[in-house]
């Protein structure tokens, strides 16, 4: 089969608003040795029924796009009371840390770090909606093969099993 190679910088910046179409289906073909899992979408997984999703829900991971900025900012501002305690290095006012410029800086930092194979930043999407982010970071290549994983999810999906499913998909 034919394997498409995407330029990660173009996908995350998405100047023409078409990048989301490239992630409608999971990637196929051999994984890149330096960038396994990025920029790719995962297959959909079915979340079990819960109080949040009585019939369950479909979830997947995909790369961050410029167009995710509005949802990222809105959800993180709404959930300041949950997120601030676990982000102790945040020194500026919460609204300023989640401005349009802050989103752009965040996206550019992750894009650069992903291109250098140091992180794998992905959006958590449930039923086609942005609900959070999961990131593998400080990726160590070679014999050590180590990293950390971090995530946050919007309060609207807390209790639905999203974080364990997202972290399992991210490390898989």
Set out the residue ranges of the language-model regions.
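Conserved acetyl-CoA-binding loop-helix of GNAT-fold acetyltransferases
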Residues: 152, 159-172
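GNAT-family acyltransferases
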Residues: 1, 5-156
